[in-house]
Structure formats: C-alpha cells, structure tokens
C-alpha cells in the first residue's frame, strides 16, 4: 500500500513540475491533422517537356503538361487555404504562450510543420524544375513557393506582365514572353510558374551549394560537382561557362542541370572577386 502511495506521489509531483503536460496539445494535434488532410489531396504527376532533348517534345506533350498544371494549381490553392489557417493558428498560440518553454515548443512545432511541407513540395515537384534550385525554383508554382517560404515579404515593383515574390535574400519572378505584348494580351496574362530566381542574400544556399560571397573558383567547384549533362546537343560533358575572370563582372553558365533538374542558364555577378548576385534565368 505504501509503495503504491509513494508511486502516486512521485507521478503527481512529476505532473506539477512539468506544468501539467503540453498546454497546447489539442490545438497542435488539430493543426497536424488539418495539414495531413490538406497534403493528402490528389495531385497530378507532371513532367515538364524539355526542349533541349532530341527529338524535341511534341505539341501534345506541352498541351498535356498545361492541362495537368491547371489541375495541380487548383488542388494547391485548396491546400494553401488550410495551410494559411494553420500558420495563423500557430501565430495565435505563440501570442498566448506565457512561458519561454511553451514558446520554444511552439517554434519547434512550427518548424516541423514547415519541414513536412518542404518534403511534400519536393515530392510533387520532381520532373518539373530547371537549373539550380532553392527547394523550389524555375518551374515551381507560386503556391509551392508560398508553401516553402510563407507569404512573400513583398511582391516587388510589379508592372503589367510581371510577377514577383520577394523574400530575404531571394526573389522569384515571371515575365510575359513573346516580344512586346499588346494591351489585350497583358490584361489576360496570368502567371502560373516561376521563370527566374535571383539570390542576393548570404542567408541562402542553393541546392547546388552556391552561396553569396564565394570566390569564382569556389562557385565553379560546387557547380561542377553537381552538373549533369542532359542537353544532347552539347558535344562535351564539361560545364559550359563564359568566364570574364575579372574582379567585377558577369559570368554565364549555359544549360546547367543537376540530377533532379532540366537544363537552364545561370548568371553570376562578381564584385571584388566575390559572388554578389546569382541568377537562374533563361536569358
């Protein structure tokens, strides 16, 4: 009897010391369930046609891709509604948290939610991205960018025919193509995917391993390590680059691809021999 009473007192003391368990357990469980439900929605598996391949993709390949992209974006819009709710709920819980331990636990929970989203986006992005990437990149939908990085800090200085999502150290962008667009075409234009990414912050590392502040030799070392020749028109397996070798200047790497991505161009701006701006863009 005394042994049972002692065990009961020990358990009671443990509960008191630990603050009676997780204060926000129910809320976190509900958020996790909503996130899981959102990411279990059916999405089409897309493979973006690669014009550098031989023979080049047929018109039907592009038509099929565009139709699938429409379905994907529709599903992702529904997911984002739930994810934005989750973000708002987590922010509310952080505002209610009184103890530092509670805040720390909620931040860890928020990071776990983001990591789950990143894993999901990586899975559904396979076969659609080009060049160097930043988890998301050229070929990603705007919805996927927000899933990974959250709502943009700003949308840049947009004008008709452009779209930008700006984050600390990163800018995702799309610009209408096909020459000078007519007013009618500008009015109807809707951006669906990212076409270029610019990295300027030291807080970011590309998936190839490039960071701002690297020397020219460091940049090319990591790019060569990740480069995979995928353009059948290229006659060599070597990384194709136009280097200025000037302390201040631009370099261009053409048809850069990794194991997971299709060929795309890279533009490197150096100042005082260090990488200052890194752009993934078609031209």
Question: Model-predicted segments: where are they?
Answer:
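Repeat-blade elements of multi-bladed beta-propeller folds
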Residues: 247-254
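Generic N-terminal leader/processing signal
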Residues: 1-2, 21, 26, 97, ...
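Sec-dependent signal peptide recognition
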Residues: 3-9
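Repetitive helical segments and hydrophobic/amphipathic motifs
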Residues: 12-13
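Short helix/turn-capping signatures at newly exposed starts of structured segments
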Residues: 20-29, 33-38, 46, 74, ...
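Amphipathic, non-membrane alpha-helical rod segments
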Residues: 43-101
